[in-house]
């Protein structure tokens, strides 16, 4: 069944209701599937793939559903392998899924749903972030992978699915059904109504109009890349690109081809490894991220248009408010707008800066025909004002409307793999052994009674640190908070202790307290800093037999915490591009912190839903895709822990 409807009509809500993930507030459901008799009997793919990823590696992410179904390890591996192949993931399963591109993440999330082998498969725009060729492969894979399942697909682009579905249901406002039946019959009988509802385009996309003085030869070059490569970010082939005044350039290519890298290089967020990048000054560049909420900083829609100090033309801002169709929402809170309204607001706010260069990342993803047309109209407004526009997109209508088109080649599968994670001796130890090391060291630190004993007690930690640190920088970053805390404790002890303030005797007492706190915390921080969150969960669930659900929930949270830095970078860079301050501006940092908190809370809610969509809610008993073995090395680790326990006491005895 194909589920269609305008943006905000309730398609995602209907899918969640079918999956049993919503509580009824009013009315009653008839003909709904019975409650699942096993975890994963119903599989739901959410619209935002980043919220559907729950593990530290691609393998464990795809295995999450089969684990909830308590399958054996051999069957889990088989299902994961088949699902990865069916979804055309094509990247190393040991990689972190959040390091993948948006299109790759969408395929990973799809693989996680297919691995459930569900009887009812619910897909929310499963190919929205994919290039046409890959999207066709994924559609074929979905149909092949679920031959006996009931399939319900929510989609804005109907044409590719129509030959494969038996029923077309179209939703109007508030999820009310306005059409239901065999696809050809519905399209024939209600074509005009579907066009009016934004389900079908109003007509074929018009070719781009040639604007006076903006032909390719006449237009001046606004920004350019010459022989640019950034191999570390997927852009391996030398790239040449010219963006000209008043022209719209569409940037396309399969997932992982380097589209985001091209955008980041033009914006100055990534430096080319080879070649040169020429761009306007920062005040003349505007960008619209794929998630428009990352760019919002004001309390109202009207204030958002003039939030940037570079948006000085107030009449222009008012005009853009009208052109974007947001005048009636001028006093609304930006975060409360619909997805299409948020995208139009982000584009209008960017245009209010009167930029020479406008860069957009997938501005029409998840939008219906009317809202896609509204976005194209705003981009036409930008080029009419002489702005050079670059848009990374898979939208065929937007590509057809572009003046220029640059298609990046598919990444070379035979190219060099990403550098492997550096192995260290601590990797040979079970996570529980590393936890034991930290606990025993903390207990032993209470034996420190003098500054001499405290310094001597740190000797084993100093000698063992290289065996637990993957990089010098990473180890130093983990130790900085401890050292700052120790310095603060030494200062306050010397100032406020029993000895005369800041006297020689007081400083020695402060040194003792500082050494004790370092001995208490540092071994555990260094040991556990190398532990993979998923491996720790395996150990807690299998070795200590802790309840699986809280263990898994904690592991998912730890994985997300490890990627907060990426969210922080996106949020702060977006604000810096709008001229709202430098990376060290207190005002910018305060606003970015609040935005990160809001983004994290919303993401956590969506992730909980994604976990339940893969059987987590009903997983009273679950299995683990990988074992958590104990080896001989763990005996050595336990011995080191015993040394850390008794050494501070021995050190104290040695110094007398």
What are these regions (language model features)?
Residues 419-453, 457-462, 566, 570-656:
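Transmembrane alpha-helix interface motif
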Residues 96-100, 104, 333-337, 341:
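Conserved ABC ATPase signature
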Residues 115-119, 352-356:
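A short, proline-enriched helix->beta-strand linker immediately N-terminal to the Walker B motif
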Residues 75-92, 223, 314-329:
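Conserved ABC ATPase "signature" region
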């Amino acid at each position: 069944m194909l589920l269609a409807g305008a943006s905000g009509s309730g398609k995602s809500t209907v899918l969640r209701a079918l999956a049993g993930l919503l509580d009824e507030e009013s009315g009653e459901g008839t003909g709904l599937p019975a409650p699942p008799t096993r975890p994963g009997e119903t599989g739901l793919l959410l619209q935002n793939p980043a919220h559907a990823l729950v593990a530290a590696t691609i393998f464990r992410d795809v295995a999450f559903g089969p684990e909830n179904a308590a399958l054996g390890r051999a069957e889990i591996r088989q299902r994961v392998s088949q699902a990865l192949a069916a979804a055309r993931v094509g990247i190393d399963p040991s990689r972190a899924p959040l390091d993948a591109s948006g299109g790759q993440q969408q395929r990973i999330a799809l693989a996680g749903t297919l691995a459930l082998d569900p009887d009812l498969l619910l897909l929310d725009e499963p190919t929205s972030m994919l290039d046409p060729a890959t999207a066709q492969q994924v559609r074929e894979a979905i149909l092949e992978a679920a031959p006996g399942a009931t399939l319900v697909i929510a989609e804005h682009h109907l044409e590719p699915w129509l030959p494969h579905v038996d029923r077309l249901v179209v939703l109007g406002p508030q999820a009310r059904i306005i059409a239901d039946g065999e696809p050809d019959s519905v399209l024939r009988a209600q074509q005009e109504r579907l066009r009016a509802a934004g389900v079908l385009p109003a007509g074929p996309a018009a070719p781009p109009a040639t604007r006076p003085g903006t032909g390719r030869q006449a237009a001046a070059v606004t920004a350019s890349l010459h022989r640019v490569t950034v191999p570390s970010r997927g852009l391996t082939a030398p790239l040449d690109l010219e963006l000209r005044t008043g022209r719209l350039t569409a940037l396309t290519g399969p997932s992982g081809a380097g589209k985001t890298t091209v955008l980041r290089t033009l914006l100055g967020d990534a430096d080319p490894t080879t070649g040169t990048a020429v761009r306007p000054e920062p005040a003349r560049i505007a960008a619209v991220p794929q998630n428009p909420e990352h760019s919002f900083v004001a309390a109202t829609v009207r204030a958002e248009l003039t939030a940037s100090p570079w948006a000085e033309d107030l009449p222009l801002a008012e005009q853009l408010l009208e052109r974007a169709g947001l005048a009636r929402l001028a006093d609304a809170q930006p975060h409360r707008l619909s997805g299409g309204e948020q995208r139009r607001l982000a584009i209008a706010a960017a245009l209010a800066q009167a930029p020479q260069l406008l860069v957009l990342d997938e501005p029409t993803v998840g939008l219906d025909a009317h809202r896609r047309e509204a976005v194209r109209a705003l981009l036409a407004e930008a080029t009419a004002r002489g702005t050079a526009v670059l848009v990374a997109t898979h939208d065929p209508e937007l590509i057809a409307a572009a003046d220029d088109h640059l298609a990046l080649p598919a990444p070379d599968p035979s190219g060099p793999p990403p550098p492997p994670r550096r192995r260290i001796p601590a990797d040979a130890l079970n996570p529980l052994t590393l936890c034991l090391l930290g606990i025993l060291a903390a207990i032993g630190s209470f034996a420190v009674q003098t500054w001499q004993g405290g310094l001597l007690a740190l000797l084993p930690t100093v000698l063992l640190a290289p065996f637990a640190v993957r990089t010098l920088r990473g180890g130093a970053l983990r130790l900085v908070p401890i050292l700052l805390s120790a310095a603060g404790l030494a200062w306050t002890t010397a100032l406020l202790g029993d000895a005369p303030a800041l006297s020689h005797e007081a400083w020695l007492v402060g040194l003792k307290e500082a050494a004790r706190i370092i001995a208490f915390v540092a071994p555990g921080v260094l040991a556990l800093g190398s532990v993979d969150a998923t491996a720790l969960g395996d150990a807690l669930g299998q070795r200590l037999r802790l309840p699986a659900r809280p263990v898994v929930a904690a592991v998912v949270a730890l994985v997300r915490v490890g990627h907060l830095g990426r969210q922080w970078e996106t949020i702060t860079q977006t604000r810096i591009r709008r001229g709202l301050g430098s990376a060290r501006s207190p005002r910018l940092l305060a606003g970015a912190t609040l935005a990160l908190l809001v983004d994290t809370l919303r993401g956590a809610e969506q992730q909980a839903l994604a976990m339940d969509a893969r059987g987590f809610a009903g997983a009273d008993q679950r299995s683990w895709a990988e074992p958590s073995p104990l080896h001989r090395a763990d005996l050595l680790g336990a011995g080191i822990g015993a040394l850390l326990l008794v050494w501070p006491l021995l050190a104290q005895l040695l110094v007398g």
